[in-house]
Amino acid sequence: MAITALPSADGQELTIQIQGRFDFGAHQDFRDAYERVAITPRRYVVDLRNATYLDSSALGMLLLLRDHAGGENAQISLANCSPEVRKILAISNFEQLFKIS
């Protein structure tokens, strides 16, 4: 599992890339990815292209990111979701909270 935070050149967007299992073991690294950056982004992208697994802990971490980013006003996209990940997000009604692609 690896988590990488990539701020955009203008500092307006933060992309968080997830590689491998996105589960409880990723909690601290995921939190650090958005709390310990030198910018205050307006938009967040969680790139799940290389995520091989996602569990209920990951769903909770996404909700914590949403709270950190402003709750209902947060601009967060969950990008490059596999069909399996999309199914988990749909069952959890996350399409009402996040932009999913």
From Swiss-Prot:
PROSITE patterns, per the entry: STAS
Highest taxon of the lineage: Bacteria
What name is this protein filed under? Answer: STAS-domain containing protein PA14_20770
Q: Give GO MF terms, alphabetically.
A: anti-sigma factor antagonist activity
Its localization reads: Secreted
Keyword Phosphoprotein found: no
CC annotations in GO:
extracellular region
Post-translational modification comment from the UniProt entry: Phosphorylated on a serine residue, possibly on Ser-56.
Give TM segment ranges: none
**Which keywords are on file for this protein?**
Secreted
Occurrences of domain STAS (ranges)? 14-101
Mention any Pfam family matching this sequence.
STAS_2
Question: Does Nucleotide-binding show up as a keyword for this record?
Answer: no
